[in-house]
């Protein structure tokens, strides 16, 4: 080796000036050095690109308040961004510094070289165990994970849920129909062939309740010593028993007379109406020994005649009348 060098360089290696030949620099393995460890060797554009990529990686890996993938690459201040060194193997992980909670505010990029960051952009994923990283997730992240893990219902389960919903709906409608049937049985109705609808039932119930309210407010005596009648031309009278002990409710059937032959009459073509009375008074007159009985009769309205009458007016105009 020396013979070959002397053959080509008769003056020896000492003839080269020192700036061109440094034994330490010549025999140093440059390939083993990390260019990121020495920030002075990086150019300005390369340094800016490294910082930009580091910030982008941090934003990508930060999920649900914790960075579980990567940590930001060191920039101009590698000691400020680097995670703290691990302690002894037996030292607990709770004593590690620079670790922040998931909800703590993140420090801006880049960090100042002279002071440590207020909170690292990653919650020390390199020094925390998987259990500690999982415990750092906040309540919202846990709820989101639970929603993602919600299992999909099978077709059989969906069919069972639909059947249960249908059964509940049928029971609800059946209870409503039973309630309307009970309401129809407590109010006097017309000799109407078709069963009253729910709307007509409510209208008649409102009128009947108003009639009963008028009786209570007027404080009319309820006496069962006799029964009242419904007079008028062509009218008929159904009397009850005149026994003093009879306190049962009495129904007075009132007929309007023969059907009017005139088509312009409002009652043309309508069947007779039934009136219901819960109170009556006796006015005994000694003249010719005649007894006149009067009663306050509530006459239900025919739903077929309510087309021209608004629903609001029926509460203010209860369908009852005085007959004698």
Swiss-Prot record:
Region (Disordered): 302-324
One term under GO cellular component: cytosol
Disruption phenotype: Early postnatal lethal phenotype characterized by a lack of the exocrine pancreas, however, islet-like endocrine cell clusters are formed. A redirection of pancreatic precursors to intestinal fates is seen. At 16.5 dpc embryos show reduced size of cerebellar primordium and cerebellar aplasia.
Keywords: Cytoplasm, Developmental protein, Differentiation, DNA-binding, Neurogenesis, Nucleus, Transcription, Transcription regulation
Gene3D superfamilies in alphabetical order: Helix-loop-helix DNA-binding domain
Domain bHLH, residue spans: 160-212
GO terms for biological process, alphabetical: amacrine cell differentiation; cell fate commitment; central nervous system neuron differentiation; cerebellum development; exocrine pancreas development; generation of neurons; hindbrain development; neuron fate commitment
Tissue specificity field: Expressed in precursors of pancreatic islets, acini and ducts.
A GO term, aspect molecular function: DNA binding
Localization per record: Nucleus; Cytoplasm
Function as written in the Swiss-Prot or TrEMBL entry: Transcription factor implicated in the cell fate determination in various organs. Binds to the E-box consensus sequence 5'-CANNTG-3'. Plays a role in early and late pancreas development and differentiation. Important for determining whether cells allocated to the pancreatic buds continue towards pancreatic organogenesis or revert back to duodenal fates. May be involved in the maintenance of exocrine pancreas-specific gene expression including ELA1 and amylase. Required for the formation of pancreatic acinar and ductal cells. Plays an important role in cerebellar development.
PANTHER family referenced in this protein's UniProt entry, alphabetically: BASIC HELIX-LOOP-HELIX TRANSCRIPTION FACTOR, TWIST, PANCREAS TRANSCRIPTION FACTOR 1 SUBUNIT ALPHA
SUBUNIT field: Component of the pancreas transcription factor 1 complex (PTF1) which is composed of TCF3/p75, TCF12/p64 and PTF1A/p48. TCF3 is responsible for the nuclear import of the p48/p64 complex. Interacts with TCF3 and RBPSUH/RBP-Jkappa.
Listed name of the protein: Pancreas transcription factor 1 subunit alpha
